[in-house]
């Protein structure tokens, strides 16, 4: 009976440790995604650049970095 109790305690500790490690991994993934979000927001929401078919004189003025003649074009 003592061996069974010890075995159950060890199993409970291992399961709780595994659950804690999974939770930390999931939080790390969430942090990774949240770090990427501002760069996308800066590019499209904060504007500061001209969208597709807007007038431009240089590549740097376009959100796509592609000024063709006098308007912003797609990336390719």
Curated annotation (Swiss-Prot):
Recorded GO cellular component terms are: extracellular region
Q: Taxonomically, which superkingdom?
A: Eukaryota
Q: Where is the signal peptide, in residue numbers?
A: 1-19
What coarse category fits the chief subcellular location reported for this protein? secreted
Alphabetically list the UniProt keywords.
Cleavage on pair of basic residues, Disulfide bond, Ion channel impairing toxin, Knottin, Secreted, Signal, Toxin
> Tell me, what is one Gene Ontology molecular-function annotation carried by this entry?
toxin activity
Q: In which tissues is it expressed?
A: Expressed by the venom duct.
Family, according to the entry, reads as follows: Belongs to the conotoxin O2 superfamily.
Query: Which residues form the pro-region?
Result: 20-41
* Disulfide linkage: 49-63, 56-67, 62-72
Query: What protein is this chain from?
Result: Conotoxin Vc6.9
Q: Where in the cell is it found?
A: Secreted
Its biological purpose is as follows: Inhibits voltage-gated ion channels.
Organism expressing this protein natively: Conus victoriae (Queen Victoria cone)
Free-text comment on this protein's domains from its UniProt entry: The presence of a 'disulfide through disulfide knot' structurally defines this protein as a knottin.
């Amino acid at each position: 009976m003592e061996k069974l109790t010890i075995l159950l305690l060890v199993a409970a500790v291992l399961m709780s440790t595994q659950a804690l490690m999974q939770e930390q991994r999931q939080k790390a993934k969430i942090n990774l995604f949240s770090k990427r979000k501002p760069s996308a927001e800066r590019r499209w929401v904060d504007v500061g650049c001209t969208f597709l078919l807007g007038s431009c004189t240089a590549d740097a003025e376009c959100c796509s970095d592609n000024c063709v003649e006098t308007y912003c074009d797609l990336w390719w």
